[in-house]
Regions:
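Charge-rich, solvent-exposed alpha-helical interaction surfaces
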Residues: 26, 30, 123, 127, ...
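Ordered, amphipathic secondary-structure segments that act as subunit-interaction surfaces
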Residues: 80-106
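Well-ordered, non-membrane alpha-helical segments in soluble/globular domains
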Residues: 22-26, 74-90, 114-130
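Activity-critical C-terminal alpha-helical subdomain
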Residues: 107-193
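Charged phosphate-binding loop/patch that engages nucleotide di/tri-phosphates or the phosphate backbone
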Residues: 193-232
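Short glycine-/polar-rich loops that comprise or flank the Walker A/P-loop
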Residues: 1, 100-101, 134-139
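Domain-level signal for Mg2+-assisted phosphodiester chemistry and nucleotide/NA-binding surfaces
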Residues: 1-78
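Acidic beta-strand-to-loop metal/phosphate-binding motif
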Residues: 4-10, 99-112
Length: 232
């Protein structure tokens, strides 16, 4: 099994293979508890930097989709998924045809407090469609709602209790009391990828214990679907 990931930067997925981010660690933890080993420890993964993905997305020609118009925001998610799928097909040539691939595309939803769940669902659907268009059926959207700081706060500040309300916060860093600032206030310092990695390694952030956050539950369910399909 081989994991291909792309995110936004050092504080989530990471920027290169030897500098994994906290979201990659959480993904690996979820997978390892189901397959019995770590894909990170076995070097069975690669991180596609956001800029490389963006450059590839710019080269993608639109397909004919009569009667279906996408909003610019969801088109961004769709094209990024297609780009990651195309890069995965290139990677396939290096790792061989007999090794199952799992693709994870991380993007914060970044919705406002007034955003409805439908907007987040549209982004999820756009990523899945982008993967499928490029013949990838083992793709997994990872879209924290409104952003990954909500998941981290659930573990560190809320102690895994009453976390669903965090998904109603604004994802705008310029809003009053933004999630990023809430996390910094709780930590007493900036929530860097390195710091969050240390807390994951210390068991302070456990993806299995975050239960009542719909966006994380959706990610877990989709990843489990993919893993179940690959084990058949």
């Amino acid at each position: 099994m081989f994991l291909i990931l792309s995110g936004e930067g050092a504080a989530d997925i990471g920027i290169e293979n030897d500098k994994v981010g906290p979201m990659t660690k959480l993904i690996d933890s979820w997978i390892a508890r189901r397959i019995g080993y770590s894909l990170i420890d076995t070097n069975s993964y690669t991180i596609i930097p956001k800029q490389q993905l963006t450059d590839r997305a710019k080269q993608i020609k639109p397909l004919s989709r009569k009667g279906k118009k996408q909003q610019s925001e969801t088109r961004y998610f769709y094209k990024n998924a297609r780009a990651l799928a195309l890069l995965a097909h290139q990677k396939r040539k290096e790792i061989g045809d007999n090794i199952p691939l799992i693709l994870v595309l991380f993007r914060d939803a970044d919705g406002t407090a007034s955003s409805d769940r439908g907007e987040w669902e549209d982004k999820m659907r756009s990523i899945l469609t982008g993967f499928e268009v490029e013949q990838i059926l083992t793709g997994v959207p990872m879209i924290p709602n409104p952003k990954s700081e909500a998941w981290v706060l659930c573990a560190l500040r809320n102690k895994y209790q009453h976390c669903a309300k965090l998904e109603d916060e604004s994802g705008n860093d310029r809003s009053p009391n933004p999630l990023k600032q809430q996390l910094e206030n709780h930590l007493g310092e900036t929530g860097t990828g390195i710091l969050l990695n240390d807390k994951i390694d210390a068991g302070e952030i456990d993806i299995d214990r975050i239960k009542d956050m719909p966006s994380l539950t959706a990610f877990k369910q989709r990843l489990d679907e993919v893993l179940a399909g690959l084990s058949q």
